[in-house]
Amino acid sequence: MSQSGKNGLTYSDAGVDIDAGNLLVEKIKPAVRSTRRPGGDGEIGGFGGLFDLKAAAFTDPVLVAANDGVGTKLKIAIDADYHDTVGIDLVAMCVNDLVVQGAEPLFFLDYFATGKLDPDQGAAIVGGIAARCREAGCALIGGETAEMPGMYSSGDYDLAGFAVGAAERGKLLPSGDIAEGDVILGLASSGVHSNGFSLVRKIVELSGLDWSAAAPFAERRLLGEALLEPTRIYVKPLLKAIRETGAIKALAHITGGGFPENIPRVLPKHLAAEIDLDAVKVPPVFSWLAKTGGVESREMLRTFNCGVGMIAVVAAENVAAVSEALEAEGETVITLGRMIVRDEGAAGTVYKGTLAI
């Protein structure tokens, strides 16, 4: 007989706490309301989230959708018991993928799965999601919280995000006029962002440090906290530069695969990106990872952003205007390389210089 009473088993006996789920919804409602924007001003709790595209003031929009997760960076958050920033990563990974196509993020939905729901932990995660939805200008219109005992170990959870944006027809990126001699600008990252954390965790294991140790690469910070530095969101600076200058031909979000996997995705087949590694300002975290793990430069470049979280392709005569527009919004911009003719069978990304790790 169930311990819950003489009437047999309950859902709670099976490990699912409906009351905890309801409590979480109440806890996150103020954060969700704070993300309202034109077109997205409904309440959570319905069977589906609503968005009024007409109210967003587009004339002839094309919708752009993206979804992503945070990967094994979550394992550090779980082990370090620090959950406030992973929601930021979740939003960033999705909305940065929208803006590279010239799209303005409109709305966001999240999926939070766990073995046992902790409403306070869930509220911390959703609070991070809501904060960065505000930063990106998109409404958090819904989501799913799944308590799944037996699917996840105690304390473990996973996150997925889904974002939809829009661009006016004819304004999507990349444009069709990328040419030899165009300049590649690099926008600084905030750290490791949300890729390569299986390797990061392996290196930390080899180092013998734990998450509460002092970070060897960051003064007055704990290792776990420093590695959880959230992914930078580039949306508003890039949208402003796109609209003010009309000069950005392509953007690439430097995520898993680094330069060699991500930059060629936005280039025509006859062109390659020549990257000047001497221009890359490598943050200390990457130098520590490379030295501690004995990771070669080529492997670093195909695993991590190495200090450049986004690139933009512009004509040489527009470098100053685009750089100034981005810097006015707080971005750190470097001249990273240029477009060259790609020989048949050659790689889409080639390097000169040396990565300073």
Swiss-Prot record:
Fetch the Gene3D superfamilies from UniProt.
PurM-like C-terminal domain, PurM-like, N-terminal domain
Question: EC annotation?
Answer: 6.3.3.1
Q: Which reaction does it catalyse?
A: 2-formamido-N(1)-(5-O-phospho-beta-D-ribosyl)acetamidine + ATP = 5-amino-1-(5-phospho-beta-D-ribosyl)imidazole + ADP + phosphate + H(+)
Do you know which InterPro entries this protein is assigned to? PurM-like_C_dom (IPR010918), PurM-like_C_sf (IPR036676), PurM-like_N (IPR016188), PurM-like_N_sf (IPR036921), PurM_cligase (IPR004733)
Which pathway, per its entry?
A: Purine metabolism; IMP biosynthesis via de novo pathway; 5-amino-1-(5-phospho-D-ribosyl)imidazole from N(2)-formyl-N(1)-(5-phospho-D-ribosyl)glycinamide: step 2/2
The Gene Ontology CC terms held by the record are: cytosol
Single GO BP term: 'de novo' IMP biosynthetic process
Q: Which family does it belong to?
A: Belongs to the AIR synthase family.
Q: What is this protein called?
A: Phosphoribosylformylglycinamidine cyclo-ligase
- Name the source organism: Rhizobium leguminosarum
